[in-house]
Curated annotation (Swiss-Prot):
Biological role stated in the UniProt entry: Catalyzes the conversion of heme O to heme A by two successive hydroxylations of the methyl group at C8. The first hydroxylation forms heme I, the second hydroxylation results in an unstable dihydroxymethyl group, which spontaneously dehydrates, resulting in the formyl group of heme A.
Name used for this protein in its record: Heme A synthase
GO BP: heme A biosynthetic process
Assigned EC number: 1.17.99.9
Catalyzed chemical reaction(s): Fe(II)-heme o + 2 A + H2O = Fe(II)-heme a + 2 AH2
Keyword Transmembrane attributed: yes
Membrane-crossing residue ranges in chain numbering: 7-27, 63-83, 94-114, 119-139, 157-177, 211-231, 243-263, 272-292
Cofactor: heme b
Residues binding heme b: H212, H274
Keyword presence, Ligase: no
Organism of this sequence: Alkalihalophilus pseudofirmus (strain ATCC BAA-2126 / JCM 17055 / OF4)
Membrane topology, Extracellular segments: 28-62, 115-118, 178-210, 264-271
Pathway where this protein functions: Porphyrin-containing compound metabolism; heme A biosynthesis; heme A from heme O: step 1/1
Major localization listed first in the record, in broad terms: membrane
C-alpha cells in the first residue's frame, strides 16, 4: 500500500541524513560564518560572488536544508492523511514539522544573532531527533497494510530501561556537539589517558572532552546490557533482537570512530562518520522505543 509514499519517505530520510552531515561539515570546517551575519541571503546576495570554500559549504547547507524542510512538511501532511489510522502517525508527523522548524530557527539565530556554545550544541541534537521522526514515519509507511505490526510484549522494567537509554543517548549526543562547538575535540591527547592523566579534571575544554569520553563509554556499557537483556529474555522477537544487536554494534563503531578522531588529529572523514553513526543509533533506539510502547497483541 501507498507505494509512492514509501518511496517519498525513503528519499526524505536520505535528505535529512544529508542535511545532518552537511551541518556536521559546517561545524567541522568552521564554516558557520561563511555567509556573514545575513540570513537567508549570503552576504546580502542570492548568489554570492567569488565565494570562498566556507561560503559554499554554509550556503549549500542552507539551500539543501530549505528543500529538505519543505519535503518533511509534505511528508508529514501526506502521512497524516494516509496513515492516520496508525497509532503513532499523527504524533510523528507533528513532531517532524516542529523539529525541522525549530532546527531552522536555531540555525538562522546562530547566524544573525550569534549563540552560546550550549545553544549551538542543541542544533545537532535536534537534527538527530528530526532524522528519527522521519525514519519512523518511513517505517510506518512500510508497516501499513500488514496484518500485524511489531508490538513485542516486554516487562515494565525493560521499557523503563529503554526510555532511560535513549534519553541518556541524547545527552551523549549533546555533550559531543558541545565538544565540537567549544573546540575541545583535540583537548585530550592520547587514549585512554587524557594528556597522560587518568583524571585531568572537569573544567575548560579538557574537562568537556574528558566528560564526553566518560559518558560515551558508559553508553557502550548500557547498550551492552540492553543487548544481553534482549537476547536472554526476548530472543523470540526477531525485530527487537536485531535492533538491540544493531544498536550495540553501532555504539562500538561510534566508540572506535571517537578514538580515531584523536589519533587522526580530527580528520574530516572520521568526524563525519562519528556524526553519522550516532544519528543512526538514535534512530534505532527511537524505533525500539516506538514498538515496545505499542499495545501488545
Amino acid at each position: 500500500m501507498h507505494k509512492r509514499l514509501k518511496i517519498y519517505s525513503v528519499i526524505t530520510s536520505i535528505g535529512v541524513l544529508i542535511v545532518l552531515l552537511q551541518g556536521a561539515l559546517v561545524t567541522k570546517t568552521g564554516s558557520g560564518e561563511g555567509c556573514g551575519a545575513t540570513w537567508p541571503l549570503c552576504f546580502g546576495e542570492v548568489i554570492p560572488t567569488n565565494p570562498a570554500i566556507e561560503t559554499i559549504i554554509e550556503y549549500s547547507h542552507r539551500i539543501v536544508s530549505g528543500l529538505v524542510g519543505a519535503m518533511i512538511i509534505i511528508l508529514a501532511i501526506w502521512a497524516w492523511k494516509q496513515l492516520k489510522h496508525m497509532r503513532e502517525a499523527k504524533a510523528l508527523s507533528f513532531a517532524a514539522v516542529i523539529l525541522i522548524i525549530f532546527q531552522g530557527l536555531l540555525g538562522a539565530g546562530a547566524v544573525v544573532f550569534g549563540q552560546s556554545k550550549a545553544i549551538l550544541a542543541l542544533h545537532f541534537g535536534i537534527s538527530a531527533m528530526s532524522l528519527a521522526a522521519v525514519v519512523l514515519l518511513t517505517i510506518l509507511a512500510f508497516e501499513d497494510g500488514r496484518e500485524h505490526t511489531m508490538a513485542p510484549k516486554v516487562s515494565r522494567g525493560f521499557k523503563y530501561y529503554v526510555f532511560f537509554v535513549i534519553t541518556y543517548c541524547y545527552a551523549v549526543i549533546y555533550s559531543g556537539a558541545y565538544v565540537k562547538h567549544s573546540e575541545a575535540t583535540l583537548a585530550c591527547a592520547g587514549f585512554p589517558l587524557c594528556n597522560g592523566q587518568i583524571f585531568p579534571g572537569l573544567y575548560g575544554p579538557v574537562g568537556a572532552h574528558y566528560f564526553h569520553r566518560v559518558v560515551g563509554t558508559i553508553l557502550l556499557l548500557f547498550l551492552l546490557i540492553l543487548m544481553i537483556w534482549t537476547l536472554s529474555r526476548y530472543r523470540h522477537y526477531r525485530v527487537l533482537t536485531w535492533t538491540a544487536v544493531l544498536s550495540f554494534l553501532l555504539v562500538v563503531g561510534q566508540f572506535i570512530s571517537g578514538i580515531s578522531i584523536v589519533f587522526t588529529q580530527n580528520a574530516l572523514s572520521v568526524g563525519l562518520i562519528h556524526a553519522l553513526i550516532i544519528s543512526i543509533l538514535f534512530s534505532a533506539l527511537s524505533y525500539m522505543t516506538m514498538i515496545i510502547t505499542r499495545p501488545s497483541h
